[in-house]
């Protein structure tokens, strides 16, 4: 058993009739009205325009870093790319940037200033584009936004931070409450969801804009036989931003509920802090990523799920819809095999991995967007591919697992 922090479990909505069960003194409701919990009201995503297909990436990378002579490493990256199940990725980094900042293509030369100079506008503009998409879908006055949550693990450490800059770019009010989260990593999509849930359920009139924006420019560097983690990172990660708007008690005349956040919790797998993470150095953000990460996650995933679904009496994992961080093929395959999931359960996650790679903290927002669009396209009755309850999973440094119980809404 590993330590955990939980948000509130299900609470009774006074205007609804339902059946309930009692679990350790907490009233658990399975048939609550939509809106009594924090509800996702809009989703937006954004991608930079520069696309590189995975089949071309090895040649691009070794040419860009002047490393064609490292033939063994090139063969290694080719094998990693072929086995990644990624078709293409989007990047903010351009050939012009590499020409103007050639040290970015070296392995460990000091480049922190150059990276920060380039990352600040890139991450911010991606965040703005995703937020604009969410605000457009929500279609309510921006003056109704009361809180802003911004996460990035890829630079932008100025003061005031990108949360301040985004507030001004979007024309939001000067009294909006801001929360800036740095370097949580790939699990942070679940973190912003959990934080937004706590804010919404303690401020019933709140409307929270939560944004995750990332760029791999922070970790782009030349190859080295002494650091294979760098090579894996080059094959796996992509750029993108995701945004969601969250609030309680939606006005159904003008707002459309997409998903309800029933519970949210975070767990750390003991003894795994060495497995994945990074350090900010003069050479930029230096990634470390060990091959044991998928095993750590799959060995602990059942315990995470049992803990949060036991109050609902749910033990059939195939009865759920799945919004899983697209952290890599081995993680996705491991979860599917460990839980004996039907092949279609993780199709939304696999689709996002194929199309965009691992987009770090924004990954689960992209999967959520794919899930609701897929549900509508297939004529499903709910935004969860016809299922009522689902799970959102984020994984990252720690090793940390974010586990959220999600309830779908009617698919329109």
Where are these regions (language model features)?
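Condensing-enzyme catalytic core mediating Claisen C-C bond formation in acyl metabolism
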Residues: 22-120, 216, 222-299, 303-307, ...
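Short coil/turn connectors at secondary-structure junctions
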Residues: 35-38, 142-146, 174-177, 203-208, ...
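Short beta-strand segments
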Residues: 41-44, 151, 182, 207-214, ...
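Conserved beta-ketoacyl condensing-enzyme motif
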Residues: 84-172, 183, 316-332
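A short glycine/serine-rich beta->alpha loop
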Residues: 113-119, 150, 178-182, 229-231, ...
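Claisen-condensing/thiolase-fold acyl-transfer catalytic domains that form or cleave C-C bonds
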Residues: 128, 154-156, 160-161, 168, ...
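Acyl-CoA/ACP chain-elongation machinery
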Residues: 210-213, 217-220, 269-275, 329, ...
């Amino acid at each position: 058993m590993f330590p955990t922090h939980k948000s509130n479990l299900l609470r009774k909505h006074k205007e609804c009739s339902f059946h309930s069960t009692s679990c350790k003194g907490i009233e658990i409701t399975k048939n609550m009205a939509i809106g009594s919990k924090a509800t996702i009201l809009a989703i937006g995503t954004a991608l930079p325009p520069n696309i590189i297909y995975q089949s071309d990436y090895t040649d691009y990378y070794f040419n860009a870093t002047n490393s064609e002579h490292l033939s063994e490493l090139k063969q290694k990256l080719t094998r990693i790319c072929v086995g990644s199940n990624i078709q293409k990725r989007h990047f903010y980094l351009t050939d012009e940037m590499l020409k103007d900042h050639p040290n970015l293509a070296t392995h460990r030369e000091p480049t922190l200033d150059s990276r920060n100079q380039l990352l600040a506008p890139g991450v911010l503009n991606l965040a703005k584009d995703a937020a604009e998409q969410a605000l457009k879908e929500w279609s309510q006055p921006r003056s109704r936004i009361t809180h802003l949550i911004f996460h990035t693990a890829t630079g932008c450490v100025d003061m005031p931070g990108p949360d301040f800059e985004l507030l001004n770019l979007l024309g939001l009010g000067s009294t909006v409450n801001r929360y800036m989260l740095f370097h949580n990593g790939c699990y942070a999509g679940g973190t912003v969801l959990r934080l937004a849930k706590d804010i919404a359920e303690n401020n019933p009139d709140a409307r929270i804009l939560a944004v995750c924006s990332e760029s791999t420019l922070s970790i782009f560097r030349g190859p080295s036989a002494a650091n294979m983690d760098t090579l894996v990172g080059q094959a796996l990660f992509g750029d993108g931003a995701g945004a969601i708007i969250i609030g309680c008690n939606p006005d159904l005349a003008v707002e459309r509920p997409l998903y309800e956040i029933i519970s949210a919790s975070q767990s750390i797998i003991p003894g795994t802090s060495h497995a994945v993470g990074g350090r900010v150095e003069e050479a930029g953000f230096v990634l470390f990523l060990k091959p044991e990460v998928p095993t750590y996650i799959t060995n602990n995933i059942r315990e995470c799920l049992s803990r949060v679904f036991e109050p609902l009496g749910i033990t059939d994992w195939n009865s759920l819809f799945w919004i899983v961080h697209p952290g890599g093929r081995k993680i996705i395959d491991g979860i599917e095999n460990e839980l004996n999931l039907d092949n279609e359960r993780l199709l939304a996650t696999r689709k996002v991995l194929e199309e965009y790679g691992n987009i770090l903290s924004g990954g689960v927002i992209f999967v959520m967007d794919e899930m609701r669009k897929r549900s509508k396209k297939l004529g499903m009755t709910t935004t969860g591919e016809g299922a009522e309850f689902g799970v959102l999973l984020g994984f990252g440094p720690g090793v940390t697992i974010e586990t959220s119980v999600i309830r779908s809404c009617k698919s329109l």
